[in-house]
A protein has these predicted regions:
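Metallo-beta-lactamase
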Residues: 1-40, 85-103
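Catalytic core of the metallo-beta-lactamase
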Residues: 17-71
Length: 126
């Protein structure tokens, strides 16, 4: 999200701008050039929202964050009440469903039941 749009939505730049180099990206972005960590556009909840696909030896994991709060969000397409763009969020859910169908494990942003089923830090995700 560009700084002006962020400010319009109540984000305070001082909360996030720590002086680091920032690169705005459009579309997918391979962080290391080896497909091990890829930013995926999953717009809808907020403009510019991104999820991460992480390639592990055991298969791909997608950190969906706020693109998909709960497992039931993906299964039932039940969107939260506060959504920036409903159609974009539904398209992002379709993308996550395709990744899951291809074998990726989706990590849901706020699903307490899901988080009980995965290793907790500092244990590795395998």
């Amino acid at each position: 999200m560009d700084p002006e749009s962020a400010a319009e939505r109540g984000f305070n730049r001082a909360d996030f701008d720590l002086g680091h180099k920032v690169v705005q990206i459009d579309g997918e972005h391979d962080l290391f050039g080896d497909a091990s960590v890829v930013c995926l556009p999953t717009h809808g909840h907020t403009p510019g929202h991104q999820s991460l696909r992480v390639r592990l030896a055991s298969g791909d994991v997608v950190l969906a964050a706020d693109a998909c709060y709960f497992c039931r969000t993906l299964r039932e397409r039940r969107l939260p009440q506060r959504v920036y763009d409903r159609q974009a969020m539904l398209a992002s859910l379709d993308k996550l469903a395709r990744l899951e169908a291809a074998g990726a494990r989706i990590f849901f942003g706020h699903d307490g039941e899901f988080w009980k089923s995965v290793p907790q830090a500092p244990a590795p995700i395998t």
